[in-house]
Amino acid sequence: CYHQSDLDVLQDFIDNSSATIPMIWDSDTSDSIEPLELQIQKWDENGRLTKLWFYDYTLSDDYTMSGEIPENIGNLTQLDTLNLAFNQLSGEIPESIGSLINLNYLYLYKNKLGGTIPDSICNIFPNYINFQIYENYFCPPYPTCVPIGKIGAQDISNCP
């Protein structure tokens, strides 16, 4: 049994990316991607999502996750690992990211994310073992809790 709010976040990722999701992920060959078919997932004994990977650098840019990170990402409160690298995600990091207090690994590099990094990330930053957001479009100023070396290379040509 899976926690419904966790499944809802996965469904929102699907809804945001419907045009670009690789159909090779359709393991039950139903011609539609369902939440439990999204790449690599690990669930705990209470039905909570603890690891989520939407990462396949071998796929073409035409077949990756796209759209925005759902605002309800903060509902994944048991998440330890979030790997969204090598996708076409756009928009800003949702403020609710600060609710992921169990997060130890956050990989958002090589996307099209931009805007400002929310200060709420400071709620979880001390937990990070690994934090990689390079090759996006994040604009300064960056939250003071994030060492500048962790920001990496950003395209700031469209920043105000």
Give each language-model segment a name.
Residues 2-74:
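LRR flanking "cap" motifs
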Residues 46-48, 74-79, 98-103, 123-128, ...:
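Leucine-rich repeat
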Residues 57, 63, 87, 108-111, ...:
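Consensus "Asn ladder" position of solenoid repeat domains
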Residues 110-113, 120-159:
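Leucine-rich repeat domain C-terminal region
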